[in-house]
Amino acid sequence: MDEKEFKRLLRVRARLKRKKPRFLRQEWWRYPKFKNDPKWRRPKGIDSKMRLKLKGKPRSPSIGWSSPRLVRGLHPSGYEEVLIHNVKELEKLDPKRQAARIAHTVGKKKRIEILKRAQELGIKVLNPQL
């Protein structure tokens, strides 16, 4: 796939994501236990209006809401995110396709080492703040 097509697919995905609703479980507004944990759960009730896809009821996820397969799961910049814990893991990355995200357990001293080495290798770091 050429660079131009890849950029186009990223733009298509961004446009789709803007229109995509939040898929929340049925009657999430009614119970406090659902408000604190707003995950999607398929409606299975025999009289469920949401399962029947009635007008005015919340939308359900379907294959039409998904992003193009070639850019699915990528960072908005187009890189594949890889979680990094040390400099050794950083050196395994491909700078053209992958970007590093430094794990939250990494301390300040090791983070500085990782950032220096990433700059030498030309690898993009997604969370470079100290």
UniProtKB/Swiss-Prot annotation:
Belongs to the eukaryotic ribosomal protein eL32 family. This is Large ribosomal subunit protein eL32. HAMAP family: Ribosomal_eL32 (MF_00810). The keyword Ribonucleoprotein applies. GO terms for biological process: translation. PROSITE patterns: RIBOSOMAL_L32E (PS00580). Keywords: Ribonucleoprotein, Ribosomal protein. GO terms for molecular function: structural constituent of ribosome. GO terms for cellular component: cytosolic large ribosomal subunit. PANTHER family: 60S RIBOSOMAL PROTEIN L32 AND DNA-DIRECTED RNA POLYMERASE II, SUBUNIT N, RIBOSOMAL PROTEIN L32. SMART domains: Ribosomal_L32e. Pfam families: Ribosomal_L32e (PF01655).
